[in-house]
Amino acid sequence: MPRSRINGNFIDQTFSIVANILLRVIPTTSGEKEAFTYYRDGMSAQSEGNYAEALQNYYEAMRLEIDPYDRSYILYNIGLIHTSNGEHTKALEYYFRALERNPFLPQAFNNMAVICHYRGEQAIQQGDSEIAEAWFDQAAEYWKQAIALTPGNYIEAHNWLKITRRFE
């Protein structure tokens, strides 16, 4: 039974109903419909913290999905799972892959910046200020890209850039 039929969450149920209607109305191939079903089930599993199941659904959606824009969101969600699991190197890889297909994902730039900032903080704790500065500089570059795509968002990042004199 597809996950969307067993999920008791009202919002997920509403999303599933709307998605099913759209799939019937919008002309799509059976492969596109199947890819979306796996993507939807992946999001449902991810929202419940069932990351292994979510990844299985996302990988299957990736196998079927041909549209680069849609693939970017699948890759982004895979990155989110790896971030949640503390697998930052893998997460960065998936965010990069998402941005290769869709360079207008400010949330991917933001998440990459957060990981780099975290690594900078770790380097400070280990007493390596030179490495920390390199990570902070990289975080700044990613935050600048996120802010450029969505001015007015990422206020804390914008303030950090100003305070650390990394904003131009």
Swiss-Prot record:
Membrane topology: Peripheral membrane protein
Source organism superkingdom: Eukaryota
Record GO cellular component, one term: chloroplast thylakoid membrane
Protein keywords: Chloroplast, Membrane, Photosynthesis, Plastid, Repeat, Thylakoid, TPR repeat
A matching Pfam family: TPR_1
Gene3D superfamilies associated with the record: Tetratricopeptide repeat domain
Places the protein is found: Plastid, Chloroplast thylakoid membrane
Extent of the TPR repeats: 35-68, 72-105, 120-153
Keyword Repeat: yes
Gene Ontology process terms (BP): photosynthesis
Keyword Metal-binding: no
Family classification: Belongs to the Ycf3 family.
Functional note: Essential for the assembly of the photosystem I (PSI) complex. May act as a chaperone-like factor to guide the assembly of the PSI subunits.
Record-linked NCBIfam families: PRK02603.1
Protein's recorded name: Photosystem I assembly protein Ycf3
Organism for this UniProt entry: Atropa belladonna (Belladonna)
